[in-house]
Amino acid sequence: MEELKTCPFTNVIPYGLLYDKLKKEKNNDVPENYVIEEFDKLLKNYERPNVYDEIGNATFKNDEDLITFQIDLDYTVENIFKNMIYNESGSNNSILNDIYMPYRILLSKDKNYVSVPIIRIYSLRKDGCSVLINVHNFFPYFYVEKPDDFDNEDLIKLEMLMNENLNLNSQYKIYEKKILKIEIVKTESLMYFKKNGKKDFLKITVLLPKMVPSLKKYFEGIVHVNNKSIGGIVYEANLPFILRYIIDHKITGSSWINCKKGHYYIRNKNKKISNCTFEIDISYEHVEPITLENEYQQIPKLRILSFDIECIKLDGKGFPEAKNDPIIQISSILYFQGEPIDNCTKFIFTLLECASIPGSNVIWFNDEKTLLEAWNEFIIRIDPDFLTGYNIINFDLPYILNRGTALNLKKLKFLGRIKNVASTVKDSSFSSKQFGTHETKEINIFGRIQFDVYDLIKRDYKLKSYTLNYVSFEFLKEQKEDVHYSIMNDLQNESPESRKRIATYCIKDGVLPLRLIDKLLFIYNYVEMARVTGTPFVYLLTRGQQIKVTSQLYRKCKELNYVIPSTYMKVNTNEKYEGATVLEPIKGYYIEPISTLDFASLYPSIMIAHNLCYSTLIKSNHEVSDLQNDDITTIQGKNNLKFVKKNVKKGILPLIVEELIEARKKVKLLIKNEKNNITKMVLNGRQLALKISANSVYGYTGASSGGQLPCLEVAVSITTLGRSMIEKTKERVESFYCKSNGYEHNSTVIYGDTDSVMVKFGTNNIEEAMTLGKDAAERISKEFLSPIKLEFEKVYCPYLLLNKKRYAGLLYTNPNKHDKMDCKGIETVRRDFCILIQQMMETVLNKLLIEKNLNSAIEYTKSKIKELLTNNIDMSLLVVTKSLGKTDYETRLPHVELAKKLKQRDSATAPNVGDRVSYIIVKGVKGQAQYERAEDPLYVLDNNLAIDYNHYLDAIKSPLSRIFEVIMQNSDSLFSGDHTRHKTILTSSQTALSKFLKKSVRCIGCNSSIKKPPLCNHCKENKEFSIYMQKIKDFKNKQNEFFQLWTECQRCQGNLHVDVICMNRDCPIFYRRAKIKKDIANLQEQVTSLRMDW
């Protein structure tokens, strides 16, 4: 197992100084790829093991199985030359000869090479060696149904026609042997039930993967062969080549594989095409999967490198651009998967001298080119398996690559493991039903997985903001200093100490993504999802949800000898695709316990119980003429869809789902008995992946838009049966648990949604409600087909039911103590909510559900509204922050209009695309649109702008009314009345009206109108000294509050001896600091005026 090297307490390498010294010594004649000795020594501590001797031969032989962990896969088309194919020299000649033997039949007389697809598996050996496995002799194929009257002559003619069709494309003309094989195989289409079962199909194997789509299109147009027709529907022509390989050979994503001893050829060091430790060649049949058990369910010590860059705008205006503006620092944090996160090793590459940083390797340079070249050397020699960071795909990586182009640094483009393939950046977009559509970048860094934490968080969590600061506070309860790019230039040009400050900030931005990966178990969960679904790890990051079900479906079809149509021709159906049932809610605030009955894995269970599948769907009555009515399930609806029952034929989808559910049960048992924490995390990731996978199959069949194999007949049938089961449960509960059957109360189903029903049994005792819930679940489950099962899981008490899919309650699984407050559809967090609304929603729910005090909730709401209208609310609670997107300038939104205003005021500090824009809504003229009244919070403070409290009152009213309207008769009274009649309105010097009005002078003691400040006659005569002392006291209190906030910010930035320059507007302390600073200035002015009056 690879050992983690510990970082020295502090280490500074003055690369720039040493390099300049060397240039002087050698009269500027320094070799192009020269690496300073001190830097070389540092890298050697972290390089992978060496397996070659001095002349480049491997120090081990192929007489043992080679077992490696698969990280990534791709394929390339490579030219294999004639002298290689017939080469008989060398100690491993027989092995290489066996590997290349199949290529001989592809060689033409007039060419000395053949182009073939080679699958590249990037993997990791247990000792830390990275291994490139070049897999030979596997070729792509697809299927078409063979007409009954097709004979050998027709097959020969068909091959000729396919060659002619491919030759129409000039890129294929150079290949003499394009159709490698046509075989007749017995198999069956997945679509629809057929009584005759297996038929003859043609399995057509071709030379290159890109030929498959061309031939698919050709066959879909019907091919005429000797007056006979073939085609129309093509089978398995859409499956990516890599998936085709791993499915055929039962290899799953992120698994251990075995290259059998005596069958692989170890390449000489000089023949390597990659930066991996070593490379092998092997024929596909000698690579086999290893079962996920014992030591082979563990994840090896993957090398994960998290990095972050800092750059400056040379002219000081706007956001840096790679074409002109330099990278001044790159933090690089090396972490070995499975180790404690605090053991990571920190490197910081800086432009110009930087002071030492405890626990970090500081390498500083005199020029940017040398810095970037050294970082490239670092990447190649450290050889990370994963590249991570925060938004590295959309910012850091493109900036580095584009900066390399601007500086003509050709070497910087080679960040991947394949030596001669440059990394390039392409604009791309990602679309799926679950995640929507968003623009991104596509960067080819072969062999290294780009594991961007920003994308992972956005994909898996719904948050108010996705800045690193907000996300870190949400999950790690940590804040970080946010140094705005507009002040980076000053810090960079000041001193080694100021550059240290940038470096400390940059290092933290590299460490936090690793801590998030560790905290949220991203590696474990994604590895297990790849294993469960059989999908390559990288596909989970770059493709939608459907690829996971596609992989499972193809695997099961391969096992049971079915073929899958590439284009599904759906039947005509007028059946409207309805979703799940939602029983009309009986809205209210229920003090008595509400029992919840849940169907366990409802949709997967329906599939299994009723045998719903592509392969069991009846298309033609002719196919079931020999069957009895009891052999068929009819789904009542407009079309009366029909499926054969499992006694006739077991469906593929039910088999897949059944295996996933059973596997999850076994894994959960293993978790109970497992003592090792790492193994527990692996197993927990697996059970989660199994659960998600089982629940994804239904959605796969219902994906009519952009789906890979939609079948609305199956999806409609599932939801129809689900609706009938919810309705049947309601009817059975209410008819059995009633007074006429001897129960104390009549039960009522107050709500039902998708796979659960909420029942009010009438009792006030939580334990009794649980007993009745368990009894109801067992009793009603008997009326459904196995494995459909109704389970009692929880009781809510109290329970607040607002509407369909909107409820909250205290959740009990134990009658003695509630587990948590459970909210569904009640938005306490929305991106357009200010913190005040979020706080009020949470507090009101807490008072209603935990304190069970309606009056307290009402009084709290009124008091907060009064505080708002009298300007006693912390301004930071009113701030809304949004990100400025590329296309936002086309729309009139508050943050967009403000960005335009800020640009007019000062283009140097104005926000750019990608920046966060914070705003408050201020008062305006009558009829002025809201987006025109968005203003910068600091500008509001500086100019005493009047905040539009009515806007915030309306914003509060909408979500709170939804809660209170089901509890009290007149919920509007919360937002009108005595508590709303007193308003404090600030007077601004910035309005048009202020030019014509003279601001009245007020007494700082009693606020009465006076002619001469600071005090009125009454206060001057009776209270002057006490007012003065009170102002002094207020001044000191505000100072203390400011110092406390200042110290908290200094702790966050990791240094108690430097000024706070953080510009993190997602942090509430930022605005509190600004507001208190303003208050201190006002109090200072008042105290001074009182002194002068003496």
Curated annotation (Swiss-Prot):
A motif (CysB motif) lies at residues 1049-1067. Binds 1 [4Fe-4S] cluster. This is DNA polymerase delta catalytic subunit. Its EC number is 2.7.7.7, 3.1.11.-. GO terms for biological process: base-excision repair, gap-filling; DNA replication proofreading; nucleotide-excision repair, DNA gap filling. GO terms for molecular function: 3'-5'-DNA exonuclease activity; 4 iron, 4 sulfur cluster binding; DNA binding; DNA-directed DNA polymerase activity; nucleotide binding; zinc ion binding. Belongs to the DNA polymerase type-B family. In eukaryotes there are five DNA polymerases: alpha, beta, gamma, delta, and epsilon which are responsible for different reactions of DNA synthesis. Its cofactor is [4Fe-4S] cluster; Mg(2+). Coiled coil: none annotated. It is found in: Nucleus. The gene is POLD. It comes from Plasmodium falciparum (isolate K1 / Thailand). Heterodimer composed of a catalytic subunit POLD and a small regulatory subunit. [4Fe-4S] cluster binds at C1049, C1052, C1062, C1067. PROSITE patterns: DNA_POLYMERASE_B. InterPro entries: DNA-dir_DNA_pol_B, DNA-dir_DNA_pol_B_CS, DNA-dir_DNA_pol_B_exonuc, DNA-dir_DNA_pol_B_multi_dom, DNA/RNA_pol_sf, DNA_pol_B_thumb, DNA_pol_palm_dom_sf, DNA_pol_type-B. Zn(2+) binds at C1003, C1006, C1016, C1019. Keywords: 4Fe-4S, DNA replication, DNA-binding, DNA-directed DNA polymerase, Exonuclease, Hydrolase, Iron, Iron-sulfur, Magnesium, Metal-binding, Nuclease, Nucleotidyltransferase, Nucleus, Transferase, Zinc, Zinc-finger. GO terms for cellular component: delta DNA polymerase complex.
